[in-house]
C-alpha cells in the first residue's frame, strides 16, 4: 500500500491485546507488511505457499489472517474503514438503508463437498455470496453458503444480523428473488421494510434498475480480486474474511485519494 493509504488506515487498526494490558506476547512483525501480504494474495489470487519472498513467511501471514478472522479483528477494521469512507462522502457513519443481493460462484477443489452445492437457476456449482450493502455499495454484512441455498432462506439470518449490528437501518431494497413471506417476516419480526424493486413488463434486455445496481456493482468490485474469481477457501468463514479484505483494499485507496477542492 502507498504511504498515503498507510497514513489513512493506521489509526483504524485494532489494538493488540498486549498493548491494552490484556496479556499476550508483543507481535514480532510489522502490521503494514502483513496487510500488504494479504492484500497481495487477495488481489493476485495466489496460493498461501506462493507468497513472494519480499513478504514475511507464508505461515506467519496465514496465522495473522486466521487470528484476525477468528477474533473478529478483520470485521472491526473493515467496519471502521467503512465509517470513515462514509464520513468522507458527507454521510453519517451508520447507514439507514441497504441493498441485499446474492451471487453464485464456482468452487475450487479445495472447497469441501458439505459446503458447496448447485445453483439450478444460474447453473453454477459452488458457493453463494449473500451481501447487504449501503447506498454507496460498501459492505455491511456478508454470508457465504452452498450455492443451492435459496436467496430467501439465507436472507432471514442475514437481515436479522444486519438489524442487530446496524440499528439505524429501517429500509432494504431487494430483487424479485426475495418476494413472498420474507417481506412480512421482516416487517413483523425485525421492524424492517423490505422493498422489492422489480422489472416491468416493458423492459427488455439489460436494464439498470434503481438501487439494485448498487449491490451488483459491489459484486463487480469483488470480482476484480482474483482470489474471489471463484471460491478457493476451505471454510466459509475464510471466504467471508477474504471478501472483507477485498473491500478493505478498495476503501483504503478511496480514503487516500486527494479530495477535490470544495467537495464535501
Regions from the PLM with identified roles:
Residues 1-264:
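Short alpha-helical elements
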